[in-house]
């Protein structure tokens, strides 16, 4: 576990607990996504790293860039001030990622990586999503990528469950059994 994860975890947990209490999980996802994107821009990274920029300037810049909804949200403004004062703004992408893990656990959503030989049609994606939801007893969020080296089929990873339905995987198993 990296130091940044260890440092980001309490922030993410506190934000999650606040969002849960306020019943605003999706809104806070949007806020954190926007903040994480902003701090990763080269200009913002340079400005934040510049010792000549004050905490007040950094806070003002972030609130200005992020728009009017930030000006009306005291909790969000307090978060920005806290992260700025503690020199933790660059942890926002990590905080956002940890927040999303907490949110997925709360909403019983499991992110499933699907690597397919070819593009899946919307109907195939729907069937796959329904089948996995039923098998795993959770809602699933599919993250689909294409890999022609599979030769056909798909490779599915959901947490520590791996389903290798690829032609390449079957050929590897056949080769292993023939070699034994």
Swiss-Prot record:
It is found in: Cell inner membrane. Disulfide bonds: none annotated. Keywords: ATP synthesis, Cell inner membrane, Cell membrane, CF(1), Hydrogen ion transport, Ion transport, Membrane, Transport. Its main location: membrane. It is a peripheral membrane protein. One of its GO terms (molecular function) is proton-transporting ATP synthase activity, rotational mechanism. GO terms for cellular component: plasma membrane; proton-transporting ATP synthase complex. PANTHER family: ATP SYNTHASE DELTA CHAIN. Belongs to the ATPase delta chain family. F-type ATPases have 2 components, F(1) - the catalytic core - and F(0) - the membrane proton channel. F(1) has five subunits: alpha(3), beta(3), gamma(1), delta(1), epsilon(1). F(0) has three main subunits: a(1), b(2) and c(10-14). The alpha and beta chains form an alternating ring which encloses part of the gamma chain. F(1) is attached to F(0) by a central stalk formed by the gamma and epsilon chains, while a peripheral stalk is formed by the delta and b chains. F(1)F(0) ATP synthase produces ATP from ADP in the presence of a proton or sodium gradient. F-type ATPases consist of two structural domains, F(1) containing the extramembraneous catalytic core and F(0) containing the membrane proton channel, linked together by a central stalk and a peripheral stalk. During catalysis, ATP synthesis in the catalytic domain of F(1) is coupled via a rotary mechanism of the central stalk subunits to proton translocation. This protein is part of the stalk that links CF(0) to CF(1). It either transmits conformational changes from CF(0) to CF(1) or is implicated in proton conduction. This is ATP synthase subunit delta. It comes from Legionella pneumophila (strain Corby). The lineage of its organism: Bacteria, Pseudomonadati, Pseudomonadota, Gammaproteobacteria, Legionellales.
């Amino acid at each position: 576990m990296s130091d940044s994860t260890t440092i980001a975890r309490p922030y993410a947990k506190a934000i999650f607990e606040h969002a849960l209490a306020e019943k605003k999980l999706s809104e806070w996802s949007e806020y954190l996504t926007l903040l994480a994107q902003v701090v990763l821009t080269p200009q913002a990274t340079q400005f934040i790293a510049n010792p000549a920029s004050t905490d007040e300037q950094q806070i003002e810049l972030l609130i200005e860039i992020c728009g009017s909804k930030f000006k009306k949200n005291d909790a969000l403004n307090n978060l920005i001030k806290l992260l700025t004062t503690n020199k933790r703004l660059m942890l926002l992408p990590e905080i956002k990622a940890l927040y999303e893990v907490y949110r997925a656990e709360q909403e019983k959503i499991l992110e499933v990586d699907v690597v397919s030989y070819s593009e899946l049609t919307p109907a195939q994606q729907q069937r796959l999503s329904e089948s996995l939801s039923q098998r795993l007893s959770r809602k699933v969020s599919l993250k689909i990528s294409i890999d022609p080296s599979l030769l056909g089929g798909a490779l599915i990873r959901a947490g520590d469950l791996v389903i290798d339905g690829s032609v390449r995987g079957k050929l590897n198993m056949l080769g292993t059994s023939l070699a034994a």
